Amino acid sequence: MQLSTTPTLEGFTITEYCGVVTGEAILGANIFRDFFASIRDVVGGRSGAYEKELRKARQIAFKELQEQAADLGANAVVGIDLDYETVGKDGSMLMVTVSGTAVKVRR
């Protein structure tokens, strides 16, 4: 399945708009893991533990998006928007949302 943040795909013609599709992932944060990550895992201003969780959440959200698009008979999703937010008490959870327009395309 073709995925794009742009409204079109170069070299393809959109033949049908199938609808808006979304994917969400909410991952809980482990307080002790996060505490130790902030102490020992920050290298050059980056935290490997947080980055791993972000990648995992993003993969889940994109998988849901693609499954919804496939259920609509689409072979591409255009206009994708990806957002990250902390939710829950004291930002204890990470939410990743992805949305776009499911379309059918041909070369």
Swiss-Prot record:
Check the record and name the Pfam families matching this protein. YbjQ_1
Q: List the disulfide bonds.
A: none
Would you say which domain of life the source belongs to?
Answer: Bacteria
Q: Family, per the entry? A: Belongs to the UPF0145 family.
Q: What is this protein called?
A: UPF0145 protein PC1_1703
Q: Which organism is it from?
A: Pectobacterium carotovorum subsp. carotovorum (strain PC1)
